[in-house]
Amino acid sequence: MYDNLKSLGITNPDEIDRYSLRQEANNDILKIYFHKDKGEFFAKSVKFKYPRQRKTVVADGVGQGYKEVQEISPNLRYVIDELDQICQRDRTEVDLKRKILDDLRHLESVVTHKISEIEADLEKLTRNK
């Protein structure tokens, strides 16, 4: 699993926190950030440079001939697919944690309200005697 990341020397893909991708001249720059350890000020990161793929395509206009376009390297595309799987999984786990915490807060509120209601009913019973 994550063969493309492993081919970059990333032995433990589960340590990946996020990534960024930018274009510089004729290259795409991929920067992968790892989870910070306790006491670290900055997250550890690695940077990779991919040359952009050049293609010659037919121009849109009549009689225009051909034009050269640049696009992302196929290898980089595969790496990004794997990174998206990892980063999306992390977001899903965070969203699930947030949902569970919200559910707990709601349950706490409902139980507190019900306890107050029962105590009020008990108070009414003791006043009527």
Swiss-Prot record:
Taxonomic superkingdom: Bacteria
Cited Pfam families: DUF3461
Organism for this UniProt entry: Enterobacter sp. (strain 638)
Protein name: UPF0325 protein Ent638_0703
InterPro entries: UPF0325
Family statement: Belongs to the UPF0325 family.
